[in-house]
């Protein structure tokens, strides 16, 4: 299987690569559009700001290639937010692959960023996580509101989408590569996923 991690220059690529390699898969980290198009699975990780990541994707001419993919794609953390239509972080238009918006988490007396372990409440139609109260590791100040594209939610002062999906595009607000057995199982299911 050909697994590609997109190099946005705004991500900790090494930890994601090691997590996939531990599952027995070879990984290519690239910003080459043809290699991304040819992949069986594409992972879009991200750390930093949506504005910087979108600038990098535009500079590398990866926006349209990412929009044209038909294979399973997994956006992680900022990568999930990039799949949405817009982010309040820098007031930037994103890839618009999942018609949702990324907004700043409300200040509910809890520290921001939301950093640490939290539970997931997956929906019945989530092909990547099937157990409630699965603990995952989060680091974020922006989130997607729960809507029809939500396949798992979490709570931190307010309920937010911890996983989203539209067609072949999946997003995880948390870091599966840092989320122990739950994250490992999610990555394994993503890599073995068959789309209908």
From Swiss-Prot:
UniProt keyword Amino-acid biosynthesis present: yes
Gene assigned in the entry: hisH
Residue numbers annotated as active site: 77, 175, 177
Cellular localisation: Cytoplasm
Keywords in alphabetical order: Amino-acid biosynthesis, Cytoplasm, Glutamine amidotransferase, Histidine biosynthesis, Hydrolase, Lyase
PROSITE patterns in alphabetical order: GATASE_TYPE_1
A GO term, aspect molecular function: glutaminase activity
One Pfam family matching this protein: GATase
Protein name from the UniProt record: Imidazole glycerol phosphate synthase subunit HisH
GO biological process: L-histidine biosynthetic process
Self-association and partners: Heterodimer of HisH and HisF.
Domain of life: Bacteria
Stretches assigned to the Glutamine amidotransferase type-1 domain: 2-196
Any one annotated GO CC term: cytoplasm
Function description: IGPS catalyzes the conversion of PRFAR and glutamine to IGP, AICAR and glutamate. The HisH subunit catalyzes the hydrolysis of glutamine to glutamate and ammonia as part of the synthesis of IGP and AICAR. The resulting ammonia molecule is channeled to the active site of HisF.
Biological or metabolic pathway of the protein: Amino-acid biosynthesis; L-histidine biosynthesis; L-histidine from 5-phospho-alpha-D-ribose 1-diphosphate: step 5/9
Reactions catalysed: 5-[(5-phospho-1-deoxy-D-ribulos-1-ylimino)methylamino]-1-(5-phospho-beta-D-ribosyl)imidazole-4-carboxamide + L-glutamine = D-erythro-1-(imidazol-4-yl)glycerol 3-phosphate + 5-amino-1-(5-phospho-beta-D-ribosyl)imidazole-4-carboxamide + L-glutamate + H(+); L-glutamine + H2O = L-glutamate + NH4(+)
Organism: Idiomarina loihiensis (strain ATCC BAA-735 / DSM 15497 / L2-TR)
InterPro entries attached to this UniProt entry: Class_I_gatase-like, GATASE, Imidazole-glycPsynth_HisH
EC numbers: 4.3.2.10, 3.5.1.2
């Amino acid at each position: 299987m050909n697994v590609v991690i997109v190099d946005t220059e705004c991500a900790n690529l090494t930890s994601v690569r090691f997590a996939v390699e531990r599952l027995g898969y070879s990984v290519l980290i690239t910003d080459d559009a043809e290699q991304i198009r040819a992949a069986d699975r594409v992972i879009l990780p991200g750390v930093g700001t949506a504005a910087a990541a979108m600038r990098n994707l535009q500079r590398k001419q990866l926006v349209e290639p990412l929009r044209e993919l038909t294979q399973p794609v997994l956006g992680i953390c900022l990568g999930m937010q990039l799949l949405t239509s817009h982010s309040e972080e820098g007031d930037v238009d994103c890839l618009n692959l999942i018609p949702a918006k990324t907004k700043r988490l409300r200040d509910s007396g809890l520290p921001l960023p939301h950093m640490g372990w939290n539970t997931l409440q997956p929906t019945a139609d989530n092909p990547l996580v099937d157990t409630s109260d699965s603990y995952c590791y989060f680091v974020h100040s922006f989130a997607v509101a729960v809507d029809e594209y939500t396949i798992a939610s979490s709570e931190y002062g307010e309920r937010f989408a911890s996983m989203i999906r539209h067609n072949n595009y999946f997003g995880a607000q948390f870091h599966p590569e840092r989320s122990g057995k739950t994250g490992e199982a999610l990555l394994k299911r993503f890599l073995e996923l068959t789309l209908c």
